[in-house]
Regions:
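C-terminal motif of bacterial Sec signal peptides marking the signal peptidase cleavage site
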Residues: 15-19
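Bacterial N-terminal signal peptides that target proteins for export
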Residues: 1-7
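Cross-family detector of peptidyl-prolyl cis-trans isomerase
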Residues: 20-212
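Repetitive helical segments and hydrophobic/amphipathic motifs
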Residues: 11-12
Length: 212
């Protein structure tokens, strides 16, 4: 219980620095969110490429150039650090996917949540993912997900599903295997419940592994 209270205090504290007054219009909050994303991109030297260029590069981003592709339908910026080992999720298939992640408040550029630190390294966020006619849906296992524990929701942020058409889901079976690894900048509309409510953009560093 103390861990949960401590965790919620950290998350709420991070969100508080970007909370808007009741007098703020939603449009103003959206503009603030876009401005914070642009500042984050400049600060971190991110090279934004178009979807057309991304496709020409074989649906890959050049990490050495710090490339992120802007996916227009979602507004999510994505960098594929590693495509991963194994196979992509097939149409009609449902799979358990295990995730390690860092969640960063874009406006404050501060870490909000992570299951990679010592306090929470015993929790690997588990989600059940289904692909149907090219569309991905997913839900967290509330008994084994820090995101679900923190935000009181089994809903997986839409932004987390954006990389799934481009990555392989597998398990490490040899020294040369690598998990799928992506970095995302997720606008509030594609984010978790608090981010959506507070009109808060978040950045994520996530690895994806196929569960058993």
């Amino acid at each position: 219980m103390k861990k949960i209270i401590f965790l919620l205090a950290i998350v709420l504290g991070a969100i508080a620095i970007t909370s808007c007054s009741d007098n703020d219009s939603y449009d103003k909050q959206l503009k603030r969110g876009r401005k914070s994303i642009n500042k984050f991109i400049v600060k971190h030297g991110i090279n934004v490429i178009s979807e057309a260029q991304f496709e020409k590069q074989g649906n890959k981003t050049d990490v050495s150039k710090n490339q992120y592709v802007l996916l227009n339908n979602s507004g999510v910026y994505m960098q594929i650090v590693n495509e991963g080992t194994g196979e992509k999720l097939k149409n009609g298939e449902t799979a358990t996917v295990l995730c390690r992640f860092d969640e960063t408040n874009v406006q404050g550029d501060t870490l909000m949540l992570s299951n990679r630190n010592l306090r929470w390294d015993g929790i690997v966020d588990k989600m059940l993912v289904t692909r149907t006619s090219g569309t991905f849906t997913a839900s967290f296992d509330k008994s084994s997900s820090l995101m679900a524990l923190t935000y009181k929701s089994e809903s997986v942020p839409k932004g987390w599903l954006v990389p799934l058409p481009y990555i392989k889901l597998g398990r490490i079976t040899s020294a040369t295997d690598q998990l799928a690894h992506v970095r995302l900048i997720v606008p509030s509309a594609q984010g978790q419940s608090f981010a959506s409510k507070e009109v808060l953009a978040c950045a994520y560093d996530i690895t994806f592994q196929r569960g058993v």
